[in-house]
Amino acid sequence: AEQFALLEAAYPGRIDLGIGRAPGTDPVTAWALRHGGGGVEEDAAARFPEAVATIAAMLSPAGVGLRLASGTHVLRATPNATSVPDLWLLGSSDYSARLAARKGLPYVFAHHFSGRGTAQALALYRDEYQPSPAYPEPQTFLTVNVVVAPTLEEAQRLALPNLASMVALRTGQPLQAQQLVDEVEEDDLTHATGVLARQMRDRWVVGTPESAAAELRSLATMFGVDEVMVHPVAGAVRGTPIDRAPAREQTLRLLSAALA
């Protein structure tokens, strides 16, 4: 809350704060975070709605009141909030859609994660939406994995490292440093993991600037969302500087020109 309050003070009206209950990692690490040594309490996920309300209150000028033995204390993310960042609830299930609707918050569906259940979750959110003072109408956007290159063949090659990482995550393998395009090509995916990789890639936007722009517009229209968030996932090749991501920069540059 403090970090986003600072960003909002520096760039008022330009900051979005997304809150989700998933830790964004493999099942073993997720268990360790929630239950293992030093992790949060077992009921932390169940208390997620309370956490959302607390963060929203801390960002507001009024703050959140905490009752202690010494009296009621007010916590604020910043001493003098003149504006607050837009709060978006993140999710990939009916649970998150219902919670966002109940709290009258904008909703982000993690379409990049599985690509399944998108229409159902968004319809549920809109049907059950309860207007709030800050957000009288439902607001939605999708997240999409995108790789764009001058040719389809190059885009497909650049997608390989992230696909391999996602296959490892889905099949319970330990997470490691992402491979280079050349390394994935040399390793070659087995038949089983190759099928899984192709299924995931089919839900991504991988192609030329023109085809990618058309596909993103089609997704936005199909699901009736207000915005689409592009997640550039193009990998690196041998010789790429470790502090740069030229293939991801290329994705954004080419896509921006095609959408202009």
Residue ranges of predicted features:
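Glycine-enriched alpha-helix->loop->beta-strand junction motifs that scaffold or abut catalytic
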Residues: Y11, A101-V108, L163, G224
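Structural preference for beta-strand elements that scaffold enzyme active sites
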Residues: R14-G18, D86-W88, P106-V108, Q139-F141, ...
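A conserved active-site cap/scaffold subdomain adjacent to cofactor or substrate pockets
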Residues: S93-R116, A121-L122
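Flexible, glycine-rich active-site loops centered on histidine and acidic residues
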Residues: A1-G63, Y107, G115
